[in-house]
Amino acid sequence: MRSLLSLGLVLLAVPSWAQAPDEDKPEGKNTPIIVVTGEGLEETPASPAYSSREIAREQIVTTPSGTVEEALGAVAGFQQFRRSDSRSANPSAQGVTLRALGGNATSRALVLLDGVPIADPFFGYIPFGALATERLASIRVTRGGGSGPFGAGALAGTIELESAGLDTLAPFGASLLANDRGATEASAILARPLGAGFAVASARWDRSQGFFTTPEDQRVPATARARYDSWSGSLRGVAPIGTSVELQANALVFDDRRTLRFEGADSSASGADASLRLVGRGEWQFDALAYLQTRDFSNVVISSTRFVPVLDQRDTPSTGLGGKLEVRRPVGGGHTLRLGADFRRAEGELQEDAFSAFTGNVTERRRAGGSTSDLGLFVEDDWSLGELVLTGGLRADRTVIGDGFYVARNPSGGIVEEVIASRRIDWSVTWRAGAAWHATDTLRLRGAAYRGLRLPTLNELLRPFVVFPVVTQANAALRNEELEGYEAAVDFTPAPGVELTATVFDNRVDGAIANVTLAPNLRQRQNLPAIEARGIELGARAAVGAFSVDGTLAYTDAEVVGRGPSAALDGNRPSQTPRWAAAATASWRPSDGWLAALTLRHVGEQFESDLETDRLAPATTLGAFFQAPLVDALSLVVRGENLTGETIVTRNADGSVDLGVPRTFWAGLRYGF
């Protein structure tokens, strides 16, 4: 903790020492104007060739639930492994994906916060409890494989979270809300100029006794509400170095504790992240980044028949580190050339104890651990030819899986099972290419093709787990996943303030990692021959006077290609994967500071497993957000979740069901938003 406080002081000092005023230098009309943004380099000219959608700050901070997950839900096709959000899910199940490329709790989409990958180094899940909506300026979601910086993780797409700066934030902002079950959501954010730069400090605390995820007719005395207690704090400093270079420093700490289904079924996720970034906007533009993450996770599994602990995953420390260097060399002739390299390394270790449900005695002590790394080299060129923009990129990755082991010992120390994984080194080449043509002032045609890559996580390689009574085995021999995809689209703006888009796509993931069912209560992570996903994505935005609407719709036909051990899965839909997904928000802003919005979400039928036996019924929810100014920058806020009381089934294991959030009302005050 002392080191974290020291880092915070350094961050707050950065803007002042990096650009201290020179009192001996007189100001004159030739003094250059220095502007810091806290952002990365601008998007390249061909970025519109790929299927992307931006979520603005106003939409991020006005969701019915107040969570980043719901803001991302505005893009149909975005999904986590389960339908539950970070208030009622096990953190390790919160991997994210796009385009129904699911069936796995690990993230198949790359998630970046200010350019830094934020997935957990061991599990690959996204720590949504550490992400606060009020800290963000925008979110950009790009669907389809990537080949640029950190492209090896962008199998299904890239989600870029951009932190808010002085141009977005008030000098001071705060909010306090409570719901009808006694839950509270409190946050504060301070933004101030320091020298020629600025600093932002923020904190957030969410807590609740939760709701019952277990249906009333399945509850037992040991049944517990989905309690949570989560806090996070961040510090950010931005400062100029000279006239065209800026330094960005970020630190984030968080702790997230949850209880799910039974008393004692407690989980925790915690971490401390730090990064430094140099962005140059001169003739030779560059983006240099280095980051370090320390994370931990714990989880207790309770027997669903005797309601006592059967597994204590007491400690899972992990470390992630990496960096990138991207250079944009001026070449002229309408070209924008990007050259660069990036590196990521993850290492971690699992320590857990298994107990007898009958005696309470330890039956096994288990340890597992290892490391993975990826070194990538990339080049990409955009060529602007009037109304036509062409782009092409190439990426080479050297991936290493090493130091892997799993050992289970009996109480006396004897080895019950031991796996020592061999060190594996691979080189892979991926690419992407696209074109965007402005056929008229209102019509743009675009198309793209790409090949992407994802390295297995340490969790997939080495950690078995139990969701009682189902056991899922690890597999140290897993190969990299590789995606190849194509898409074509049309963007139409028939009138000012009106945007329509339609995209058709065809994606195939070779070697997709899935929990393959071997027996009724036994699964193993295996590389499937493939998952194929074809579909269409529609989007619409319109703003007329005080009214606006934003909507997306996705239909995806995803199926498993199975052979050998997975032959029984051939033609089945991947687990937890819907065909239909839709989202729409209608807003009314009668005057400054007032806002009323309704949000509709729909997710189609899903199946709990790849055998398509346990069905999750379609769910349609309605949410609301209302804000009214009171005095100065103080506003009244009222929110509503699942207003129609829809039954949202998030898990169905042979009739044992978990439910999502019920009808919920929030009310409170906001200042400075």
What are these regions (language model features)?
Residues 336-440, 455:
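Signature of Gram-negative outer-membrane beta-barrel scaffolds
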Residues 116-143:
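Short acidic/polar hinge/loop motifs at secondary-structure boundaries
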Residues 384, 390, 498-509, 526-610, ...:
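Gram-negative outer-membrane beta-barrel transporters
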Residues 264-282, 312-320, 365-374, 419-434, ...:
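Outer-membrane beta-barrel signature, preferentially recognizing the C-terminal barrel domain
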Residues 69, 73-116:
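Extracytoplasmic beta-strand/coil segments of soluble accessory domains associated
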Residues 191, 195, 239, 436, ...:
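Conserved C-terminal beta-signal and adjacent last beta-strands/turns
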Residues 147-148, 160, 167-177, 189-269:
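Periplasmic-side early beta-strands and strand-to-turn transitions of outer-membrane beta-barrels
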Residues 294-298, 347-358, 400-415, 423, ...:
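Surface-exposed extracellular loop regions of Gram-negative outer-membrane beta-barrel proteins
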